[in-house]
């Protein structure tokens, strides 16, 4: 239903944000930003 769809969207957004933070951190650590 709609609640499941919203929950999945929220999970996807959270995963995307986390991935972005990880990418930013790793590029800073490796000095490749």
Curated annotation (Swiss-Prot):
Q: Which GO terms describe its biological process?
A: defense response to bacterium; killing of cells of another organism
Disulfide pairs here are 27-33
Keywords, in A-Z order: Amphibian defense peptide, Antibiotic, Antimicrobial, Cytolysis, Disulfide bond, Hemolysis, Secreted
Q: Which family does it belong to?
A: Belongs to the frog skin active peptide (FSAP) family. Brevinin subfamily.
Top-level taxon in the UniProt lineage: Eukaryota
User: Could you tell me where this protein is found in the cell?
Assistant: Secreted
Q: What is this protein called?
A: Brevinin-2Ea
| Tissue localization of expression | Expressed by the skin glands.
State the GO CC annotations.
extracellular region
* Record InterPro entries: Antimicrobial_frog_2
Q: Which residues form the signal peptide?
A: none
What is any Pfam family matched here? Antimicrobial_2
Q: What does this protein do?
A: Shows antibacterial activity against representative Gram-negative and Gram-positive bacterial species, and hemolytic activity.
């Amino acid at each position: 239903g709609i609640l499941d769809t919203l929950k999945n969207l929220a999970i996807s957004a959270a995963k995307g944000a986390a991935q972005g933070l990880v990418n930013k951190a790793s590029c800073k650590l490796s000095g490749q930003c």
